[in-house]
């Protein structure tokens, strides 16, 4: 079963449609390039006094989202969440957020909504996107080697935009080992980029040997960044690809992956962990224990204290917007280290339900036997696994691929619904003529 063959729309597309697809894919490529070389570009653009130009791809994402939303065909569930999204923004305003907070949150999530409404164009132009992603993967691997073997000038560099100090590249270490970020801003972002770029390129590879070699190189590079969650997620995703034809096994695993991500932050509230023992032993699980003991319980307690468990803090009160436009008393919502908790802190119970909607999304992609479907399935599973300990909505490229997967499934569902009446043909019986 093929959910949404991208070539179908492209075969009969007009010149205008062709131009729109080209613009969309160029915006996506510009976003991917900026995120891949973010650390280096911020350093050199700041030196040249043109650092604001780095934000143009996300601005273009917002503009294309607004243009495509007018004609985007989606079901009631999508529009219900759009309304909930708007109401959540009003709730955030009641919780002392400013319009700047809402605007910056929309800016941060712009790749997701852009990928969602423009998914058909991105799938149609996937070969052009493939060349860009292939280049960015090679650059990311080269960046790992460069950062590991030399001293790059943008390492630890900070700069100012207006009165706000921003980091071009975060320098830090884990267990006295430098966390390699390459050309990117942060090591964990680099590892996510390598994982997603590799999984995307699998769609175009025919040789299993080449796929195995590429996955081995990618996994080694991710390990060099010392990012544990992306390394484990990528390895598990590769295992899932080997059993993807066992549909019911894949379904069960997907349900487990989603519910573990949803319930993991609550584990520290019901169980006791000895942080001192783990920290003193230098265990690789020390960061996870820190989240279980400090980060996640503190966020949950803050939601309970403020009475925001059901409604959430609101759209504009969670994530990096708290660092740029802080709201007094809400600084704890700057980072969750878990995407399910991120959504819950933002939207309340609705956020939790939104996170569980990954299950039907993954089920639809499991049913899809096309190369596009398999690619989006692997990226979506990897996305969900990394989200256990990462705020994935703060990673632009992760947002782009999440929007692409959601838009792909929504578009396929709408096409299936509109094509059903055409499948019904009534013919008169010969004896009744």
Show the residue positions of the predicted features:
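N-terminal signal-anchor transmembrane segment
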Residues: 2-70, 86-92, 383-385, 400, ...
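Hydrophobic transmembrane alpha-helices and their immediate junctions
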Residues: 22, 208-209, 242, 250-252, ...
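Long extracytoplasmic/lumenal interhelical loops at the membrane interface
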Residues: 37-47, 273-347
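Helix-loop-helix junctions and helix-breaking kinks within/between transmembrane helices
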Residues: 41-51, 91-106, 185-188, 210-244, ...
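Transmembrane alpha-helices of multi-pass inner-membrane enzymes
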Residues: 62, 376-387, 391-433
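Aromatic-anchored transmembrane helix interface
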Residues: 80-86, 96-120, 128-132, 137
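Alpha-helical transmembrane segments of multi-pass inner-membrane proteins
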Residues: 130-155, 174-176, 181-225, 231-244
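A membrane-periplasm/extracellular boundary helix in multi-pass inner-membrane enzymes
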Residues: 142-151, 245-284, 301-305
């Amino acid at each position: 079963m093929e959910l949404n063959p991208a070539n179908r729309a492209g075969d009969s597309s007009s010149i205008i449609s062709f131009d729109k697809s080209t613009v969309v894919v160029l915006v996506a490529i510009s976003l991917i390039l900026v995120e891949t070389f973010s650390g280096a570009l911020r350093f050199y653009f700041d030196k040249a006094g043109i650092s604001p130009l780095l934000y143009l791809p996300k601005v273009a994402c917002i503009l294309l989202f607004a243009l495509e939303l007018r004609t985007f065909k989606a079901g009631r569930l999508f529009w219900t969440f759009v309304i909930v999204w708007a109401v959540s923004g009003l709730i955030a305003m009641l919780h002392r957020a400013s319009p700047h907070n809402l605007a910056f949150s929309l800016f941060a999530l712009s790749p997701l909504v852009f990928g969602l409404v423009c998914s058909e164009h991105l799938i149609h132009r996937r070969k052009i996107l493939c060349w860009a992603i292939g280049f960015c993967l090679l650059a990311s691997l080269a960046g790992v080697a460069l950062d590991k073997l030399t001293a790059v000038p943008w390492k630890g560099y900070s700069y100012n935009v207006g009165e706000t100090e921003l980091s071009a590249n975060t320098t830090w270490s884990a267990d006295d080992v430098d966390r390699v970020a390459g050309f990117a801003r942060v090591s964990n972002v680099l590892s996510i980029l390598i994982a997603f770029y590799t999984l995307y390129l699998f769609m175009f590879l025919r040789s299993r040997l080449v796929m195995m070699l590429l996955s081995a190189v990618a996994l080694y590079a991710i390990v060099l960044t010392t990012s544990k969650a992306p390394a484990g997620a990528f390895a598990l995703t590769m295992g899932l690809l080997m059993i993807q034809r066992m549909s019911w096994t894949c379904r069960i695993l997907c349900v487990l992956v989603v519910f573990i991500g949803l319930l993991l932050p609550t584990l520290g509230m019901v169980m006791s962990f000895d942080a001192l023992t783990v920290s003193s032993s230098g265990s690789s699980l020390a960061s996870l224990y820190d989240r279980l003991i400090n980060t996640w319980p503190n966020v949950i307690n803050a939601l309970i204290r403020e009475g925001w468990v059901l409604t959430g803090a609101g759209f504009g009160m969670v994530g990096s917007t708290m660092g740029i436009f802080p709201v007094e008393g809400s600084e704890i919502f700057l980072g969750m280290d878990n995407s399910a908790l991120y959504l819950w802190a933002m939207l309340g119970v609705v956020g939790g339900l939104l996170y569980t909607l990954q299950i039907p999304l993954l089920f639809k992609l499991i049913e899809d036997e096309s190369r596009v479907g398999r690619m989006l399935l692997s990226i979506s599973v990897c996305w969900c696994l990394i989200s256990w300990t990462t705020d994935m909505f703060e990673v632009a490229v992760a947002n782009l691929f999440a929007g692409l997967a959601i838009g792909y499934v929504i578009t396929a569902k709408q096409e299936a619904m509109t094509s059903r009446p055409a499948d019904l043909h009534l013919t008169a019986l010969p004896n009744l003529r």
